[in-house]
Structure formats: C-alpha cells, structure tokens
Amino acid sequence: MDAKIKRAEGRLREDPYEGHQMLRTLVNRQVKAKKHDDAVALLYSGAKTLFEIEQTGSAADLAIYMLDVYEKASYAASLDNKARALTLLGLFPAEEGARKQYVKRLLEWSKSAGPQGDKDVHFAVATMFVKWKEPASAEKHFVLGNEKSARAYGETMYYWFTSDSSISPDTFAGRPVLNYLLAENLISAWNSLETFTKHFTKSNAPDVENMSFDGKDFPVFKEYPQMNFLHLLIFTAYRKDKETYLSLVQKYPKKQDWEAALAKIEEIYFGIRPVSNQPNILANLMSSLFSGPPAATNQLDLE
C-alpha cells in the first residue's frame, strides 16, 4: 500500500488534474471491494498533497470523499480517525468555498460519538472558524467543545472586542457566560470570563479592586458594572440563590440584549418562571446570542 501511496503522490505533483482523477478511480475500486482502510489512506495522503501544492478544490474533494468512506464503513470517532479528519480540516484556507461543506460532513460523522457530536471535533471546528475570522460561527462549537474550549472562547471574544472597542466589553464577555449558563456548564462560564477579564485588565488598565468570593478572586470594575454582574451571576447560579439574584438585578439593570437569555437562566437556576410562555424560547435566544453583536461585524482581526 505504501508504494501505491507514493506513486499517487508523485502523480499528483506531476499533473494534479490527471493525478486527482487517477486517485479517485483507484479509490472507487477499493471502496467497491470494501478495502476501506486502503481507500482512506489514499484519500488522506492525496488530499494532503493537493493542499501542499495549493490545489485546494481537488484537495477538498478528496477530503470530503474520505468522510464519505468514514460514514459508509461506519468508522468510529477514534483518536486516529479524528486525527486524519482534523489534520485535513486545518489545511483548508479561508478562501476555499468547500470548507463549509467539509465542516458540515465532519460534524455529521462525529455524531457517532454522541447526538451532539464529538467534543474534540467541535473545538477544532471552532478554532478554524476563528482562524477564518468568523468568530460568531465559532461560538456554538466552543459551547459544545472540549475542556479547552471555554478559555479559547473567552480569548476569542476579547480579540473580537479589540476589533471594535466602541462596544462595551461586557457585550463580548457576556456571550460565553450566558451561553455556558444556558448549557448548565458553570465551570466553563467562569473560565471563559476569567480569561476575557485577564486579557482586558492587562491591556486596558481599568480602575478595579480585587475581591474574593467563595474562594474565587475576581476584579470589581468601577467603570463597567455589567462585568461585575457577570461574575456575581455565575456565583449566584452556582448557589441557586434566588434572593441574591433578585438583589443583583435590582442593582444592575438588565441589558436589553441579555433579557431573553436571563429569562431562561432565571428559570433554570432560580425557579423563576417567565411571565408568559414563549414557544421555542431557548432556540430563539441561542440563535440571537450566536449572531453578531449590535454594530459589530462577524470579522476578527488577529493580525
């Protein structure tokens, strides 16, 4: 098999178009013969080679074909199988239009690990959307991602904030906090906020006092009260302390953009029912949270 792979690589470098057609024909035969491992090895090697020589359209075609074989042969989301798929994901440039199709197929295949998909795959997809400067598209994948996701989400929101600092920092810091609280993941809510806050205080030198609550240190901002609200919201949600929460919302008036999310959070953690039952409220508010903030674009400048 190694000899076939080397011949295919050589042909691709010599004549990308003919090599691509030849490799596809060979893979078709292997799939019909149920030699799925051999087919995957050829497709993976061929896609990598084509990405290297900047034949991204043909590379994307082979990468998507590899996922087709994964599904046809019921490949599990094992470490090796994920490694191949995520390596190819990382080679897609932003300008390659087929990247979204690859992401869609990758997420569908990863559902072999569970109905929401594989956490490592979601984290990798989120990371690539950030690389492609589409942070809003990354958010739901950070929420569904692995243990690295929360801090990466907080960092992404900070860099998004720096691209449009006319918007208050709590607008960006609040996005992961509210999304993780809706997902009932308080640790990730805290980690994302802690990461955002560290970047913000280091680069902007705001007027703050340091405080400790339940063994957690956090800054109290004099200029940005809603940043304080976010920290205290996580603490009260952890304790499920309804009275303290009601005091908080008296002291810190709700931001209009947060009202729908907070209505659901109130119900989840404090047993406060919404005044009127709204159909599909969770789907609606998650959709609004994963869209771009007011007056901001879905673009991220990390240069």
Swiss-Prot record:
Belongs to the GET4 family. It is found in: Cytoplasm. The keyword NADP does not apply. May play a role in insertion of tail-anchored proteins into the endoplasmic reticulum membrane. It comes from the Eukaryota. This is Golgi to ER traffic protein 4. GO terms for cellular component: cytosol; nucleus; TRC complex. The keyword Cytoplasm applies. One of its GO terms (biological process) is protein insertion into ER membrane. Keywords: Cytoplasm, ER-Golgi transport, Transport. It comes from Schizosaccharomyces pombe (strain 972 / ATCC 24843) (Fission yeast). InterPro entries: GET4 (IPR007317), TPR-like_helical_dom_sf (IPR011990). The lineage of its organism: Eukaryota, Fungi, Dikarya, Ascomycota, Taphrinomycotina. Pfam families: GET4 (PF04190).
